[in-house]
């Protein structure tokens, strides 16, 4: 999974869950670390509103991700010069890793099951 410092909120939570469940390799840069939320906010007399975070993510290890982000397994920085040159080092590294993993763990071939006949059959 590609991650970087511009990812926050769901962009923090999804990589955290991906890592927690050991689903694959995180490639890129540490995520932003913004994973608190706001539920319900009062409307002021002038029609404006005020918000304050009142939802956070906790696990058995305690408070997670907020202000820390999710670190990648393989850190790859993407510089403006790379983008200008038409390169994406993070994507290139992720593809390289995925191809290596496919060699080590080739996908299983799956046989499509026969579909059951559910239509009424003529009597013989």
Each PLM stretch: what is its role?
Residues 1-124:
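C-terminal "post-core" interaction segments
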